[in-house]
């Protein structure tokens, strides 16, 4: 570095440089790869990527990933947003400025889930993985099943991550009414129909590392379902008719669609004994008249709700299960594109910024 007429070189130890870089956001690190070959080598290394992810995921709350499918079902808008943590009260609300949003538009039909910085989506009968932070994506060859119909195929995909082996895996599910076939298995949960037992619903837990699964029965008296409703839909959580399968404090939870200002939630208290608990929650009067559906649960102990009809400005509602209060977050200018104002589907999930590269 130059100071006055003399040239003075300041030496910064490599360990200190790395520690400084580890605390920078992904956007800055992508630019700093061009500073020098040394920095590029450091930032793109496997060890640095993992250390950076561990630091950012433990020191700051996760961001939100809001995915919109356009009116024509051809493009996806992925929006990464800061996660406003507002003290819950029935009247609390806040607004996220448009400038704070990170947006990526990709060719795709549906977003399935987001896992440790990556997002799984479908595009023209193929499955793809996208890193919204680096804007990289990778498309896999079409996955085919035996004796599968060419017209209106019914395949769903989920992304899983094995932290011990540091390996991402994609699960492809053949969801034909008369069979259920798996190609790859991650640790995600969903409900399936057991052929020959239309009144029995099953929770299937998948393990990413061992690629094995186990079943747990759902008591019909707690969760009655008919055969027409017993299907999955693709999201970071799973919909079963008018009910949503969620992760509630590490336990399996099922939340029904709010109706008449209230909703019920079932939670598995003992998976081995198949013991369930049920609680009824009441929405505040300020939410009366709004038609909600459940999207997900978050680390704050809140359930994310959205209105069935997308509005501009776009708004998310958070219901606190402990205080029975609700807050709202508004995103102004988010749906300025005409094709996304009439989005067919949308989802909300956690998102952690990651440097993981999808280049092959």
UniProtKB/Swiss-Prot annotation:
Which N-terminal stretch is annotated as signal sequence? none
Q: Which Pfam families match?
A: F-box (PF00646), FBA_3 (PF08268)
Q: InterPro entries from the entry?
A: F-box-assoc_dom_typ3, F-box-assoc_interact_dom, F-box-like_dom_sf, F-box_dom
Domain F-box stretches: 6-56
Alphabetical list of NCBIfam families matching this protein: F_box_assoc_1 (TIGR01640)
Database matches in PANTHER family: BNAA05G37150D PROTEIN-RELATED (PTHR31111), F-BOX ASSOCIATED UBIQUITINATION EFFECTOR FAMILY PROTEIN (PTHR31111:SF47)
Q: What is this protein called?
A: Putative F-box protein At3g47150
């Amino acid at each position: 570095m130059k100071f006055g007429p003399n040239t003075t070189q300041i030496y910064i130890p490599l360990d200190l440089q790395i520690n400084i870089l580890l605390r920078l956001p992904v956007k800055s690190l992508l630019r700093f790869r061009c500073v020098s070959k040394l920095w590029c080598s450091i930032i793109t290394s496997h060890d640095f990527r993992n250390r950076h992810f561990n630091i950012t995921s433990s020191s700051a709350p996760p961001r939100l990933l809001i995915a919109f499918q356009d009116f024509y079902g051809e493009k996806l808008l992925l929006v990464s947003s800061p996660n406003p943590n507002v003290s819950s009260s029935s009247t609390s609300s806040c607004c996220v400025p448009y400038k704070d949003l990170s947006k990526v538009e990709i060719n795709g039909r549906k977003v399935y889930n987001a896992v440790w910085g990556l997002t799984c989506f479908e595009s023209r009968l193929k499955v793809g993985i996208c890193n919204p932070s680096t804007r990289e994506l990778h498309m896999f060859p079409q996955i085919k099943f035996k004796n599968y119909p060419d017209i209106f195929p019914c395949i769903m995909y989920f992304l899983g991550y094995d932290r011990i082996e540091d390996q991402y895996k994609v699960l492809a599910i053949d969801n034909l009414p008369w069979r259920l076939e798996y190609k790859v298995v991650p640790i995600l949960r969903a409900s399936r129909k057991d052929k020959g037992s239309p009144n029995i619903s099953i929770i299937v837990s998948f393990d990413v590392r061992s690629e094995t699964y186990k079943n747990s029965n759902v008591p019909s008296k707690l969760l009655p379902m008919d055969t027409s409703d017993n299907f999955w839909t693709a999201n970071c959580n799973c919909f079963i008719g008018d009910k949503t399968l969620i992760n509630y404090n590490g336990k399996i939870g099922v939340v029904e669609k709010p109706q008449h200002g209230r909703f019920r939630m079932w939670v598995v208290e003992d998976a081995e004994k198949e013991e369930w608990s049920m609680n009824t929650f009441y929405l505040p009067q300020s939410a009366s008249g709004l038609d909600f559906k459940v999207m997900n649960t978050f680390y704050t102990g809140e359930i994310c709700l959205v209105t069935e009809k997308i509005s501009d400005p776009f708004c998310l509602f958070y219901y606190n299960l402990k205080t029975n209060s609700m807050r709202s977050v508004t995103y102004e200018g988010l749906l300025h594109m005409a094709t996304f104002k009439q989005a067919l589907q949308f989802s909300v999930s956690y998102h952690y910024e990651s440097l993981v590269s999808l280049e092959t």
